[in-house]
Amino acid sequence: MKTAAAEVWDRDSVLEDYRIGWESRHASLLGRKEVLSGKAKFGIFGDGKEVAQLAMARAFRKGDVRSGYYRDQTFMFAKGISSVEKFFAQLYATPDVDAEPSSAGRSMNGHFGTRFLNDDGSWRPLVDEFNSSADVSPTGSQMPRLVGLSYASRLYREVDAMKELAGFSAHGSEIAFGTIGNASAAEGMFWESVNAIGVLRA
């Protein structure tokens, strides 16, 4: 699957965005049918969020990190972090880490994450990858984590000892992106996170 182009706005890139959005919508529709017919476990899907997530994907660069929620499948498809095949492997709880790299079938569907370690236990070069912190189920809980991720970038800019840690940060220039739903934006965690990011200047 091709990924969404970051800065190119030609006919082909717009059509590619449309294709990704269309595939994501139909993955949601098919996934819901599979759940309602009893062929797959509990399902949560991202239909209706496609356009906003395609826009976010165009702004997202290597080294950036996502702290999101369970409706972000279009974004994950657009950045090549997930695919329709991996999405359905997760829906069916496939225990194969190659088929379902987010959690090897241990999480509910729509719970995405990228691996920060190689198979041998060494760190992956996060500055060269599109990163996603692992999603958790309590809605709104991605926001306090977003505070930590954004504050870490500030520390990488300002603390000399951290500048020597290669591979984790591009001198604090990465951006932490957060996504949240309407209901969760009314929770205390959301407002406390907004306040904390302001106080910490993160």
What are the residue ranges of the model-derived segments?
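Cofactor-/ligand-binding subdomain signature composed of acidic, glycine-rich
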Residues: 1-41, 62, 70-72
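Cofactor-binding active-site loop characterized by glycine-rich and histidine/acidic residues
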Residues: 33, 39-201
